[in-house]
Structures are given as C-alpha cells and as structure tokens.
C-alpha cells in the first residue's frame, strides 16, 4: 500500500514546451483507467506474435506426464492401512509443531492467493479475448499456465489441512469470499498493461513461496519446505515466460509498451488478494501483509528489487528508437523509480524500528489460527 501511494506521488519529468502536459496529479487516480485503456498495441502487431508465442512461450510449459502432482507429497489412503495412515498424519503433525503462528499466517495467505486461480484465468482471458476451446497459441498458453497453477493451491491446501494447525473452515471461507469478490487490478482492458502487471505478480508470488520454504526448513518441516520450493520454482518459470513476452513486446511496439509500463507503475494497482476476507476481519489483507513484511516473507524491498530486475531485463534505459516525446518522458520516470522505492523502504524500516522500541506491541488475531494473536 505504501509503495503505490509513493509511486502516485512521484511526479513525471517536466514536459518540454509544446508537449502534451501530464494529467493533473489530483485527477490521475480518476483518469487512470482511461489512460491505461489508451495504451493499446494494434491487433495486427499482436497477432503477428502467434508464431513467436508458439516457439518461445509455450515451451515454458511442462508436459503433464513430467509434472509433479499433489499426491506425490501426501499420504495415500488407498495404499496405507488405517494404522499406517494415522502414523503418516502424526508425522506431519510432529513436523509442523515447531512452526510459529506468524509463519502459518503467511502460509495460509499465500495458499489462499493461489486458490483464487479462477479469477486470474478470467482476467487474462478477458484481456486477450480468448475462448475456452480456442486453438491459438495464446489460448493454449492460458489453459496450460492455469493447469500448472492449479496444482499449487491444491497441494498447499491439502497439506496445511493435514498439519492440524489451522481452522480450515475459516480458511475455506476466505477462499470462497476471495473468488466471489473478483478483482480489479487497475489495468483496464489494455493487453500491454495486463502483461506487465502479470510479470510483477508472477515474480511477486515466487518470492514469498521461496521465503516460506526457507522458514519451513528452518523450523524442521522439510516436506513443507520442499512443497513451497516446488511451487516457487513453477512461479519462477512462469515469470520468466511473461518476462520474455514483454521483452518481445518492447521490441514490437516500444512506445506503447513504455507508456503501459509507466501507467502500471503510477496507477494504484492492487495486489491479487487485496479483497481477502474471512467473514470477520475487514482489513485481513493488510494484516496478512504486515506479518509478511515483519518476518521477511514479502517486503517493500522485494518490490524495489523486482523493478530493478525488469528495468534491466527489458533494457529500458537503452531504448531509443520508436519512442515519442511522451514515451521518452515516461522512460525517464520509470528509470528513476528504483531510487524512490529504496528511500520508501528505508523510511518504512525506520518507522517499524521506532514502533518496536516505543509504546505497546501491536497484536492481531487471525481466525485461520483459531483467533490466536500475532505480533505485527
């Protein structure tokens, strides 16, 4: 939340005389959707990438027979006696016993985010205008990507249930609320903005799963660590596919891609699970995010590093040909954002340290862990 407020407050470079001025700062949020919807790549240019997607994006998907499946990491009642099954579940309980409540909050938040996959598939399909049975490379990518992603929430949900550490009815309610609430990520119907947003979110999903894997291993649950690590590896592979796609789109239409990049950065783009609700806590996503920030699962600093990564991957500062005056102006803007974010991260860290040292500690109850309180 703090990050997006800072980005909105960060001004675009001053325009030269005669150039179209930037929208007034006070009206930017109101006019953001209209501005984003104006960043279009032509259908001719977009469809010219069909062959490229076939040979450079679909290759990031794995054949089903070579993919891990959730059952590979769960007790199998069809092959175990009742006593053996009980022993297997007790082993999971024992491994999970030392994991702190704050880590479980992050595990559940990550899993709930994964379980809202129907919303994400609908978002990408609506941006691309695909069909459920289409045969274009784009249609096949959406379905293949979604099929791989589906295993993530499935496995995490089942394993977390078996730990016995969670109020699964509250977790299940949270999932239903989140899918039912939909999502407005602030990218309008722009293909370019949609893909840039997805690049950030795939990488932003990889980071917390990798960090929860590290925490699970530290606290003795090597199986849960492996599960989180496998999910992180999938997310990293998917992020690489979308990153490669945007690199190609910057080649095909550098000006519109640059404008889209700036719009996504300056708009108050929401996180996928920002409408998270458990029927009790109206600020559940904020509280979950606070815990993630506190224990280092996902931080403002991670976001800053992501932006640095994409600026280098897409070689943003080196793009010269094909940019309009407005394109060059927003290029300067996005190249200056990492420094803005670093300063924001430093200020946020300073505030957290002061809060720790001054006044009473702040605790938040989470229904997912039977209303036990977690310090934030």
Swiss-Prot record:
One Pfam short name: FA_desaturase_2
Chief localisation class: plastid
GO cellular component terms listed in the entry, alphabetical order: chloroplast stroma
Gene Ontology MF annotations: metal ion binding; stearoyl-[ACP] desaturase activity
Domain of life: Eukaryota
UniProt-annotated binding residues for Fe cation 2: 149, 202, 235, 238
InterPro entries in UniProt: Fatty_acid_desaturase-2 (IPR005067), Ferritin-like_SF (IPR009078), RNR-like (IPR012348)
EC number: 1.14.19.11, 1.14.19.2
Transit peptide feature, positions: 1-33
Location in the cell: Plastid, Chloroplast stroma
Known pathway: Lipid metabolism; fatty acid metabolism
GO BP annotations listed: fatty acid biosynthetic process
Catalyzed reactions: hexadecanoyl-[ACP] + 2 reduced [2Fe-2S]-[ferredoxin] + O2 + 2 H(+) = (4Z)-hexadecenoyl-[ACP] + 2 oxidized [2Fe-2S]-[ferredoxin] + 2 H2O; octadecanoyl-[ACP] + 2 reduced [2Fe-2S]-[ferredoxin] + O2 + 2 H(+) = (9Z)-octadecenoyl-[ACP] + 2 oxidized [2Fe-2S]-[ferredoxin] + 2 H2O
Keyword Chloroplast: yes
Annotated positions binding Fe cation 1: 114, 149, 152, 235
Tissue spec: Preferentially expressed in the flower labellum.
Protein purpose: Converts stearoyl-ACP to oleoyl-ACP by introduction of a cis double bond between carbons 9 and 10 of the acyl chain. Converts palmitoyl-ACP to (4Z)-hexadec-4-enoyl-ACP by introduction of a cis double bond between carbons 4 and 5 of the acyl chain. Catalyzes the desaturation of saturated fatty acid 18:0 and 16:0 to generate 18:1 (delta-9) and 16:1 (delta-4) intermediates, expected to give rise to 9-alkenes and 12-alkenes, respectively.
Complex formation: Homodimer.
Protein family: Belongs to the fatty acid desaturase type 2 family.
Protein name: Palmitoyl-[acyl-carrier-protein] 4-desaturase 2, chloroplastic
Gene that produces this protein: SAD2
